[in-house]
Amino acid sequence: MEKSWFNLMFSKGELEYRGELSKAMDSFAPSEKTTISQDRFIYDMDKNFYGWGEHSSYSNNVDLLVSSKDIRNFISDDTFFIRDSNKNSYSIYFDIKKKKFEIDNVLSDLEFLFYSYWSSSYLNNRSKGDNDLHYDPYIKDTKYNCTNHINSCIDSYFRSHICIDSHFLSDSQNSNESYIYNFICSESGKIRERKNYKIRTNRNRSNLMSSKDFDITQNYNQLWIQCDNCYGLMYKKVKMNVCEQCGHYLKMSSSERIELSIDPGTWNPMDEDMVSADPIKFHLKEEPYKNRIDSAQKTTGLTDAVQTGTGQLNGIPVALGVMDFQFMGGSMGSVVGEKITRLIEYATNQCLPLILVCSSGGARMQEGSLSLMQMAKISSVLCDYQSSKKLFYISILTSPTTGGVTASFGMLGDIIIAEPYAYIAFAGKRVIEQTLKKAVPEGSQAAESLLRKGLLDAIVPRNPLKGVLSELFQLHAFCPLNKTEIK
């Protein structure tokens, strides 16, 4: 059991902790001087510290003792030793959970000192009007004992320091429940994990705000995005989806990548109505394949994990396919394979340069061997496109690109470009470690490592990517239709 020493002075008109504060507090604002030490506290009973809660129009007449960062250490103390102006020592014990309060050694004298103060003419002459903020409903009953009052002071003290409003409680029937009970700490000062802990457990986070506040938060979720690396918040339409604080590359949807690469008003999608028919009738008890497809379609607004079409890149006609990791992890099924195959065949017939932006977890297991056959199908039409027609194909690898996509068209580009810090591999780190029982070196599957080993041609940031692609196309004799349209 931890113990703390407090020097108290009992006099006729006031009770104070020895020490100093830079200023008196009549609000919830923290004191500018928040450092604390043993024997350095003030408890001026003439100061008013207003409580909170639905029925808390009272003032508890206590000053701010410590800042909120010291709250855990303060709560963990179960026993306090005090001494009066005559140097008589007392031991005060209170159990927050049971609201048990005990004072050893000359209990009656100590109670008398408290009772004398609360019965003083200063307190009795206070206004008891409903609009008087200094009116204390606990004091109106002269029989109110010091034990209950100290309990209420301690309870209100902790509430005010943590700055929690009354609506944070999960329901109205808990309004009379002691807040301290919900902020239980261990003797070492570390927070215990408790099922009914209303402040810090994620499971009960929805209880921390009213339904109205929750709806407002949901509405603004469309405006903000959180960085995966530094966890900073930024406007969702941040330029190029690159964190402004740490430079981390955030995931982009296929539609965002199309908007980034293709000139406005020139995008013509292909095969938008092609959807999977669940060819092998793959079903799980938890969630059938068709249900997963429907859910992904509602979430992303896409029919499958790739968008294909034609457009202009700085005035140069191109065929473009962009995979979307948000749709079932960008997995490659029969629809993805068919759409990419048709795109390549169209580019071959029209002699268009080809760009495929890869972001995938690999072949889709729900379609079995049919998904694996897409690797061979796409590779075969690419062979005709590159070898027979001598056309130009650029592969852009984003994070993550793994599995069957890496083993097929992802690594078949005439020029292979990767985004900075992209995760590119055939088998994932966890699979390798579980299979070979060996640790995978950190960063060995990052784009920078692959570039050093010659598996990539370039790592290009998002900002200059469009210009780099335009120069590569012009180098291979693909010129803009109208030079005036070049940005």
Curated annotation (Swiss-Prot):
Pathway: Lipid metabolism; malonyl-CoA biosynthesis; malonyl-CoA from acetyl-CoA: step 1/1. Residues 223-487 form the CoA carboxyltransferase N-terminal domain. The keyword Isomerase does not apply. Its EC number is 2.1.3.15. The keyword rRNA-binding does not apply. It is found in: Plastid, Chloroplast stroma. It catalyses: N(6)-carboxybiotinyl-L-lysyl-[protein] + acetyl-CoA = N(6)-biotinyl-L-lysyl-[protein] + malonyl-CoA. Keywords: ATP-binding, Chloroplast, Fatty acid biosynthesis, Fatty acid metabolism, Lipid biosynthesis, Lipid metabolism, Metal-binding, Nucleotide-binding, Plastid, Transferase, Zinc, Zinc-finger. Its cofactor is Zn(2+). A zinc finger (C4-type) spans 227-246. HAMAP family: AcetylCoA_CT_beta (MF_01395). Belongs to the AccD/PCCB family. Component of the acetyl coenzyme A carboxylase (ACC) complex. Biotin carboxylase (BC) catalyzes the carboxylation of biotin on its carrier protein (BCCP) and then the CO(2) group is transferred by the transcarboxylase to acetyl-CoA to form malonyl-CoA. This is Acetyl-coenzyme A carboxylase carboxyl transferase subunit beta, chloroplastic.
